[in-house]
């Protein structure tokens, strides 16, 4: 049976193998062959030995060469481990000096390359090898217990694989030089099982000149894996230093935890001493506290106190001069009238805007109001409290003030003689207004609305503005409160109605002059909306005030009768129906602008 493979190349053994032939009976040795000689393994070996080729692997050990060694199986994933490395004398096989009985079966079916490099002795040496192999084979055949212990087909004469590669194969038809050459290329096998040597291995010691002479004297003890110096030192200094390092690391970790617990625990008593030095309060720090007494004293009160001192000193000077004859010391220069700007903070603004009076304000009257009362002016005393000079901030009563755009304007700093209330009214919603008096007056008006008709006849000259002459609630009776509230309301209605009538008269003049038609339409739209808004609010007030405004009401009636024909379009054609104009009016016009102080809508 001759099989020629169809493949022409394989990468497993580095080269073409076209001349490879499987073993067959034609390649068997001359002479009659028994069952043993007809077995597959030695026929393969004979065919490989008798057909030398240049196409073979450099190593014969399948495990060391990182290839599967039988039937040309290879994964081609790893390289040869010992490729290109020269073999040292210590790596020579320990059983390579034996005879043919020590030879083992080649572990690959690939043909052998480098045939010239193999040490081939003469024909006499080959004949001696064959004789020794035959003698060893006959001895095995004659011993029954050896056959019982080691089966020829399973143990001693099996094809080597990764499992049973350590078994030795002895036969009489192989070439000694080839087997020795293959053993020389695979030194790792001699290290693994040196105890498989036979008795006749010492006869053929000088097989090749390249083999060392001391290879036969190597002991047959099983060697262990080679370890580095660091691993050998594991049980010595290296292990000692490793344990020292582990113990030191654990100790440092415990110390670190103890220090952190000691420093950052708050349950135990703190070792740090508390500083008992008194510091400024959080209120003073938040409000920008400055240890300056003049900040807590109004300049007006200081001036008043200095005037008192100067008057008393001027009265005493003539007597003292007459007695002593010396002039008194000149008075010190008065403080500057310029008031420093207040340092503002949220808390200071709230305190300054709050309206508080002294506890004894009902029994004390300031100097200015006393002088005015003595002069004969029937002006009720104001609610404003002027603070006297003091050295402590806590004893000064908070002055009534007003807040405009985050600026505190104390009402005591205003000039009461000229009534100079110059406050820019940018946004009336920010004003702080006390509405308690108005609420009380509204309640009194609701209770005594039936008998309050006679109080509405008071004249316009007796009305005083609430901002100019505020009166405390304690000095007024309920009837007086109701009458004053009605007077203020009637004054408001008369002023508003008069302004509206004057505007209508002016519009009438523009109409009679004959202007632009677009201007005429605009005037008509304004008049229509104005009439609808004002008629419902002012009918009752106009009836009550008809006596004082007879001429104005007649003019208003003439204007309304003459313009009634032009304003037949109604609210649908008014200018206020336009969306942009409505948005502008909604954002700019505020109802509280046309109400007296103290009323809210």
Curated annotation (Swiss-Prot):
GO terms for cellular component: cellular bud neck. Residues 1-11, 198-207, 289-304, 357-376 have a biased composition (Polar residues). Residues 271-285 have a biased composition (Basic residues). Residues 1-38, 77-101, 174-214, 271-386, 443-478 are annotated as: Disordered. Residues 89-101, 443-457 have a biased composition (Low complexity). It is found in: Bud neck. Residues 458-467 have a biased composition (Basic and acidic residues). Belongs to the AIM44 family. This is Altered inheritance of mitochondria protein 44. It comes from Lachancea thermotolerans (strain ATCC 56472 / CBS 6340 / NRRL Y-8284) (Yeast). The lineage of its organism: Eukaryota, Fungi, Dikarya, Ascomycota, Saccharomycotina.
């Amino acid at each position: 049976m001759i099989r020629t493979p169809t493949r022409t190349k394989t990468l497993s053994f580095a080269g073409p193998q076209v001349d490879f032939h499987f073993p067959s009976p034609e390649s068997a040795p001359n002479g009659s062959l028994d069952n043993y000689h007809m077995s597959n393994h030695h026929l393969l070996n004979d065919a490989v030995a008798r057909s030398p080729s240049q196409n073979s692997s450099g190593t014969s050990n399948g495990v060391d060469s990182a290839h599967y060694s039988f039937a040309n199986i290879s994964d081609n994933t790893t390289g040869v481990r010992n490729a290109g490395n020269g073999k040292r004398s210590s790596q020579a096989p320990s059983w390579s000096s034996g005879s043919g009985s020590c030879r083992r079966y080649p572990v690959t079916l690939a043909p052998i390359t480098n045939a010239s490099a193999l040490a081939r002795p003469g024909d006499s040496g080959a004949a001696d090898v064959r004789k020794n192999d035959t003698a060893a084979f006959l001895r095995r055949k004659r011993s029954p217990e050896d056959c019982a212990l080691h089966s020829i087909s399973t143990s001693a004469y099996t094809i080597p694989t990764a499992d049973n590669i350590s078994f030795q194969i002895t036969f009489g038809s192989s070439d000694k030089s080839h087997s020795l050459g293959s053993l020389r290329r695979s030194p790792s096998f001699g290290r693994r099982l040196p105890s498989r040597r036979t008795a006749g291995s010492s006869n053929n010691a000088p097989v090749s000149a390249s083999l060392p002479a001391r290879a036969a004297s190597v002991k047959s003890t099983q060697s262990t894996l080679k370890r580095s110096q660091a691993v050998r030192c594991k049980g010595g200094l290296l292990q000692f230093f490793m344990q020292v390092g582990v113990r030191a690391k654990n100790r440092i970790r415990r110390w670190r935890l103890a220090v952190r617990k000691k420093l950052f625990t708050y349950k135990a008593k703190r070792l740090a001493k508390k500083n008992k030095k008194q510091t400024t309060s959080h209120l003073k720090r938040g409000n920008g506290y400055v240890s300056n007494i003049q900040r807590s004293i109004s300049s007006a009160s200081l001036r008043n106190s200095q005037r008192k001192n100067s008057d008393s000193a001027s009265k005493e000077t003539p007597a003292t001069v007459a007695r002593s004859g010396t002039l008194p010391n000149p008075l010190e220069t008065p403080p500057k009238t310029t008031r420093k700007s207040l340092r503002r903070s949220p808390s200071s603004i709230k305190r300054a805007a709050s309206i508080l009076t002294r506890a004894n304000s009902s029994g004390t009257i300031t100097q200015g109001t006393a002088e005015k009362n003595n002069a004969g002016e029937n002006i009720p005393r104001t609610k404003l409290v002027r603070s006297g000079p003091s050295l402590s901030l806590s004893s000064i009563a908070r002055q009534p003030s007003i807040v405009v755009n985050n600026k505190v304007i104390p009402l005591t700093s205003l000039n009461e003689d000229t009534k100079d209330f110059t406050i820019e009214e940018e946004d009336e919603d920010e004003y702080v207004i006390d509405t308690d008096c108005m609420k009380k007056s509204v309640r009194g008006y609701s209770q005594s609305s039936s008998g309050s008709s006679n109080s509405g006849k008071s004249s316009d000259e007796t009305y005083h503005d609430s901002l100019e002459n505020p009166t405390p609630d304690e000095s007024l009776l309920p009837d007086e409160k109701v009458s004053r509230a009605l007077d203020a309301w009637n004054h408001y209605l008369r002023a508003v109605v008069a302004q509206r009538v004057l505007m209508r008269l002016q519009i009438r003049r523009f109409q009679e002059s004959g202007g632009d038609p677009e201007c005429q339409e605009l005037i008509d739209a304004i008049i229509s909306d104005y009439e609808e808004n004002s008629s419902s609010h002012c009918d009752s007030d106009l009836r009550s005030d008809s006596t004082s405004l007879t001429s104005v009401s007649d003019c208003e009636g003439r204007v309304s009768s003459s313009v009634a024909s032009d304003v037949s379009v109604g609210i649908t054609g008014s200018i206020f129906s336009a969306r942009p104009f409505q948005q502008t009016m909604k954002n700019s016009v505020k109802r509280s602008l046309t109400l007296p102080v103290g009323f809210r809508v």
